[in-house]
Amino acid sequence: DRAYASQLAQLMGILFGPGGAPAGPSPFDRPTAVVSGKWDSVVTLTGPIHDAAQCTEGLVLEYADGMASADVGWGRADGRALTDLLALHELYFDLAQRTFYPAQVQGSNLASHIVDTLEQAALGDPVPGALGPPGERIVVLVGHDTNIANIGGLFGMNWWIPGTQANPMLPGGALVFELWKRAGQTSAFYVRTSYVVQTLDQMREATTLTLANPPARSPIFVPGCSGEGPAFDAPLASFVRVARHVIDPSFIAEDQ
């Protein structure tokens, strides 16, 4: 509570007005509990951590959608405030989705297919579990912010985007795994990982994205395989080795 007291007080000021005190019992006074999850979640957090994250997400969506400043959080939430409040949002994801066990249970299947697809692209021959045919230059998977958080937690990856907190889960964000081959070499494949997303201000202003004015990109260091350099390139063989170590085969479905 102490670590996030200032952000919680700020959120309460936005929700309840000057003084930050509700007319009745505060929804943030009840204890946090860890309960069995539903649908695609192994566990669920209930209580103030969950509620604060949900409230923050609503305010972020108001801002990103271009609502008038007087209407975002009843005129009490600007871009700077939202940057601070994102710490509450990311706290929930860090505990519920990035913690290794739920990340492994929920992310092993997706991670396995990603690795198989990279290996297939390098080999040029079909690999069981790969997505798309050999020779496909790009594969796009549409999912949820929980999928991104699961993969991040599974590999121990972290990223940062200007105007946010660590490991932001922003609308339209994407984890990107690029397969590269160095010029003049026939078999030296490596993986370059990054998180790409529009900044909140780009969303709010409906900025046209171009090569000259791109979305924000955060290169990602993958523990156990990434090397030095600004892009943290990882040899494909090392990336696969790390992936096979953290992926639990019992949660892999070859056809899903």
Feature locations, PLM:
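Signature for phosphate-centric chemistry
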Residues: D1-V139, G143-Q256
